[in-house]
Structures are given as structure tokens and as C-alpha cells.
Curated annotation (Swiss-Prot):
Pfam families: Actin. It comes from the Eukaryota. Disulfide bonds: none annotated. It catalyses: ATP + H2O = ADP + phosphate + H(+). This is Actin. It is found in: Cytoplasm, Cytoskeleton.
Length: 375
């Protein structure tokens, strides 16, 4: 492989797709992982109507489209739509010919084997990639933080995972998945605001609430105390201007929505919170490596962007861990994109160049080659 050809790095999340070139410090393209199809054929006269729209274009035309997310809870469930997203990524966003660049894709922890094979097949057969690699998202986040051992709490839009990693290898028996992430918090905030008399119903309005969540929500260090403060004074209230000019006031919802990460019962879920899930994940690991994991808890993904989340994690994990344990929460500023950044770092390492799975190897061995080359 020639040095001058940059590898493409694509991180496909449930909510957003991040894509760009290896060696860059940030993704060039970040767009919603959605595919939209017209609700009614032939309504838009003379629009030169397409049968499908992807990403921002689908988002902006959502009034006349049915929107679908091909990635649910981090796992690809609709391959035809996924292919459309990849096509859009190569040709419209990055404007590259995929047959000229090695491609690094990311996958969810515990991704079914058949899924990796399908990914591999599409990259080689549909897009004719010269070389391909698939890496686990959380492992890339850990690399981006400059570590090879630690536990990653990766929480995005569709799913949250705790992934213990030792010397660069994820420990599958100790990986835990929590089906509670950004989208659920947005829905819960919609419910909280609805109770206050601010109804948000359409998919378009849901995007407004997502923005409110991202701009105004935070994690309280002491939830009960914060609820009391909010009840006694208006010091925690903030106002938000809706697109139509109406101004709404948001109070305890600011910290009630993200609190669901620590108390899933708020959403009616019988699951452990992110602090307890992290603890359980560490507990499933060998005694000898637990100290290294407690000392390197790395946050990753957009849902870990709430202010106050690291301090709260520190407090909760300290309460659960053995008495003499040193707990350190690492919250890199760029954690929203750390999976992509880790991929960019990995794919540009000189030592990585002989790890790619080549088209020739694929032609000789078939899709199963991915299990031997990528782990």
C-alpha cells in the first residue's frame, strides 16, 4: 500500500455517522445516520424526485419523508439502508472513490459475527475497497486517550456499553450493554417538558428538545439536594428560545433528564445505572487487573458530554469500589468524537499497515477472513 493514499475512517453510530481521513485530528463529515423515503410517490412534481435521501438532506425534508435509522442500539439492522449511508459517505460527504482508499470501519462491542462478515462483504464487493479493517468502538476511544488498558464507558445516541480493555484487547466476558442512551434521555426530557405544558410531538420538534438537552442539561452531584434547591429558588432556571420565538423556562428538568443515566427507574427500566454497570463490568474481570481498570475509567460518546458527569461518576464509583481503591475518571474534551479520533490514529500508524485485510486475501478466503485479521 502506498504511503500517500490516506485511509478512510468511518464511525457509524446509531445517531450520527462520523467520517474522514486517517491522520486528521477530527472527522470531515458528521451527519445523522438516517435514510428517508417519500411518504407518497409522485407528490413532489418536477422535483426530480429521488427514491431516498440520506443524512442532513433527509433531516431537512423530513416533513415529506418517512425516516429510518438503519443502526439500532449500535448494531446494523437494515443493510440496504446502511449501504445507502456508506455510498453517501464516500461520494457526497468525502467525495472519494472507495476503490482507491483502505477503509477502517467501527463496530459495536459484541457485534454478531455475521454482521462483521456482511460489512466486509459490502466493502469489498459493492465498493471494491483495496483493503479493509473493522475495530471495536470503545477500544478506539481508549487509544485516543493514549492508553491500552482501562475501562471505557461509551454512551452514544442508541446504546451504552462498558468495555474493559487489557493491553489493547477488549475482554468480551466482561462487556456489558445498557439500552439506555441519548435518544432515551431526549424522549424523557420531552415527557418532562410535556408535564410542564410544553408539548413536543413531531420528529421535527424532537430535534428541538435534543438541542435543549445538549445546551442546558447537566448531571447533579447530589440529586436530592439539587431537587431541593430547584424547589426553593429560581437560581437553576434557564430560558430557551424556540424557533418560533416563544421562550420557555426549564428548571429541574435540566438535571432530571440526565439523572436517568444513574437511575434508569426514571424511565421505567429495571437496569443498573451507568455507575453500577461500570462496577459490575470491572467485577467480572480478573482480580489482578481491577486496580488498573478503576484507575482508568475513560468516558466516550456524545451522551457523556453533560457537565458534572465525571464528578458524579467519581463519587458513585468510589462508593461502590473497595475501600483502598484509587478511582480515576478520564473525560477527554474531544470525547464526542474519540472513537473516530482513535480510528484516525490507528489507521495512520506505520505498524498498522500490515494488519489491513486486503482484497486479495478476501478473494482467497471470503468474508470469514475478518475474524482472523481483526480482533
Amino acid at each position: 500500500m502506498e504511503d500517500e493514499v490516506a485511509a478512510l475512517v468511518i464511525d457509524n453510530g446509531s445517531g450520527m455517522c462520523k467520517a474522514g481521513f486517517a491522520g486528521d485530528d477530527a472527522p470531515r463529515a458528521v451527519f445523522p445516520s438516517i435514510v428517508g423515503r417519500p411518504r407518497h410517490q409522485g407528490v413532489m412534481v418536477g422535483m426530480g424526485q429521488k427514491d431516498s435521501y440520506v443524512g442532513d438532506e433527509a433531516q431537512s425534508k423530513r416533513g415529506i419523508l418517512t425516516l429510518k435509522y438503519p443502526i439500532e442500539h449500535g448494531i446494523v439492522t437494515n443493510w440496504d439502508d446502511m449501504e445507502k449511508i456508506w455510498h453517501h459517505t464516500f461520494y457526497n460527504e468525502l467525495r472519494v472513490a472507495p476503490e482507491e482508499h483502505p477503509v477502517l470501519l467501527t463496530e459495536a462491542p459484541l457485534n454478531p459475527k455475521a454482521n462483521r462478515e456482511k460489512m466486509t462483504q459490502i466493502m469489498f464487493e459493492t465498493f471494491n475497497a483495496p483493503a479493509f479493517y473493522v475495530a471495536i468502538q470503545a477500544v478506539l476511544s481508549l487509544y485516543a486517550s493514549g492508553r491500552t488498558t482501562g475501562i471505557v464507558l461509551d454512551s452514544g445516541d442508541g446504546v451504552t456499553h462498558t468495555v474493559p480493555i487489557y493491553e489493547g484487547f477488549a475482554l468480551p466476558h466482561a462487556i456489558l450493554r445498557l439500552d439506555l442512551a441519548g435518544r432515551d434521555l431526549t424522549d424523557y426530557l420531552i415527557k418532562c417538558l410535556g408535564e410542564r405544558g410544553y408539548p413536543f410531538t413531531t420528529t421535527a420538534e424532537r430535534e428541538i428538545v435534543r438541542d435543549i438537552k445538549e445546551k442546558l442539561c447537566y448531571v447533579a452531584l447530589d440529586f436530592e439536594q439539587e431537587m431541593q434547591t430547584a424547589a426553593q429558588s429560581s437560581s437553576l432556571e434557564k430560558s430557551y428560545e424556540l424557533p418560533d420565538g416563544q421562550v420557555i423556562t426549564i428548571g429541574n428538568e435540566r438535571f432530571r433528564a440526565p439523572e436517568a443515566l444513574f437511575q434508569p427507574a426514571f424511565l421505567g427500566l429495571e437496569a443498573a445505572g451507568i455507575h453500577e454497570t461500570t462496577y459490575n463490568s470491572i467485577f467480572k474481570c480478573d482480580l489482578d487487573i481491577r486496580r488498573d481498570l478503576y484507575g482508568n475509567v475513560v468516558l466516550s460518546g456524545g451522551t457523556t458530554m453533560f457537565s458534572g458527569i465525571a464528578d458524579r461518576m467519581q463519587k458513585e464509583l468510589l462508593a461502590l469500589s473497595p475501600a483502598s481503591m484509587r478511582v480515576k475518571i478520564v473525560a477527554p474534551l474531544e470525547r464526542k468524537y474519540s472513537v473516530w479520533i482513535g480510528g484516525s490514529i490507528l489507521a495512520s500508524l506505520s505498524t498498522f499497515q500490515n494488519l489491513w485485510c486486503s482484497k486479495q486475501e478476501y478473494d482467497e478466503s471470503g468474508p470469514g477472513i475478518v475474524h482472523r485479521k481483526c480482533f
